[in-house]
Design a protein with these regions (language model features):
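A detector of single, family-specific signature residues
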Residues: 1-401
Length: 401
């Protein structure tokens, strides 16, 4: 058996080919194009048996290796950072370490589990969605910062400053002087022109807040121009986000196991089930145990033992997008599942913070998801509560909202 470690980079890749006895047979560098891939293929075809270890599970090189049906393993970057002897990044050294760990059958070298095309598509959309959220937050923070400097009342008129109604108001009335000149009828007319659904609830409040005397900035022209620049960007990203949500739900519903995911309480909300499928995937062999999924999702704590001492810590090394998806699912489930709501309250009563209590609930859900996933069974709330009662565990103490 031969072992190949590949240190991935943007434009080139360092390779280390190791024999079964640990001797280095070859250390070369290939380019990130078909010329380099063909050079790699020529090297591998000359070997009777070879296993490949690489740091990432996506990208053109990984796709090409999968298409060529090579035996592929993944060692995540955070593991490599921890396992480096000197903690210093070195491409050739990393390629050697990848081959070395694979030769030792290290537990951190995980077999590559190919996902379906639908899950791969959904995961790509989920990454885009996360980046859109980050960009929207960045632009929104700029808008808030500018308004605080010269127009703070605009932050209080609507539920959020980056909603379409708020952006439309700022576009028509970009200065506090223009806003204060509005009559009651003018505010009502604006809301009706924007087809605002909550006119009766918001009209009096908006008008009253505009009548409160406001401090004036000595110079505000620069702030106004910045706000005018941000408005179309935030409006565009709002529409893109909504379109992305529709596309993600469309792709999710095309997956053969969509109904299985939707059987869990709280997953019918926007993207709740879609994000779980995107980040967990549909390769059942990827997580050999429930604990493997819980650790991957970051819901299970890390337990450290030394002699007679034992300490439990928050798990930092995990898939952070999966943790966010699991936390969101746990929050949504409390509104639709009596036992989930009672379990959360029980953790609060034990003195846990809301964040930790919700994470504990997410950890329970990850175990349930893994178990039913392996059994290919639909979630049944009544059956689950009966199982908890039979095992002497806490049963439903509160009705779901």
């Amino acid at each position: 058996m031969h072992y190949l470690g590949i240190d991935w980079a943007t434009d080139k890749h360092d390779l280390c080919l190791m024999a079964d006895d640990g001797s280095i047979l070859s250390q070369i560098e290939i380019t990130h194009d078909m010329v380099g891939f063909n050079e790699l293929n020529k090297l591998l075809k000359a070997l009777p048996d070879v296993k490949i270890n690489i740091e990432r599970s996506d990208g053109l090189l990984v796709d090409w290796l999968v298409q060529q049906k090579y035996d592929l393993y993944i060692t995540p970057p955070h593991v490599m950072a921890y396992r480096r002897p000197t903690r210093v990044k070195d491409d050739k050294g990393d390629a050697f370490l990848l081959a070395y760990l694979l030769r030792l059958k290290d537990a951190d070298c995980r077999p590559y589990n190919a996902q379906s095309h639908t899950v791969t598509h959904l995961k790509q959309l989920a990454r885009t969605y996360n980046r859109v959220i980050v960009e929207q937050r960045r632009l929104c923070n700029q808008l808030i910062d500018n308004l605080r400097r010269y127009y703070p009342v605009a932050l209080t008129l609507f539920t959020k400053v980056n909603t379409l109604i708020s952006l439309a108001f700022l576009e028509q009335y970009p200065t506090p002087e223009q806003a204060q000149s509005l009559t009651y009828e003018g505010v009502e007319r604006f809301l009706r022109e924007q087809h605002y659904r909550y006119i009766q609830q918001r009209l009096d409040l908006v008008y009253a807040r505009l009548q409160v005397p406001m401090p004036q900035a000595s110079v505000q022209a620069g702030y106004v121009e910045h706000v005018k620049m941000l408005i179309p960007l935030l409006r565009m990203i709002h529409h893109q986000r909504q379109a992305l949500i529709k596309e993600m739900n469309k792709v999710f519903l095309s997956h053969p196991e969509a109904d299985w995911w939707l059987s869990f309480p709280g997953t019918k909300g926007p993207l709740t089930a879609a994000l779980l499928l995107a980040w967990i995937g549909d390769a059942r062999t990827r997580f050999p145990t429930a604990n493997a999924l819980q650790a991957y999702a970051g819901t299970a704590p890390v337990t450290r033992r030394s002699g007679k001492s034992k300490s439990v810590h928050f798990r930092k090394a995990c898939s952070h997008p999966t943790r966010r998806a699991a936390d969101n699912f746990a929050r949504q489930s409390r509104r639709h599942s009596g036992w989930a709501r009672a379990y959360f309250q029980h953790r609060l009563d034990r003195g846990h913070s809301p964040a930790r209590a919700n994470r504990d609930l997410a950890n329970r859900w990850m175990k349930i998801i893994w178990t039913l996933w392996q059994r290919r069974e639909i979630y049944d709330e009544i059956k689950h509560v009966a199982n908890r009662s039979r095992k002497g565990q806490q049963v439903v103490l509160a009705e779901a909202v």
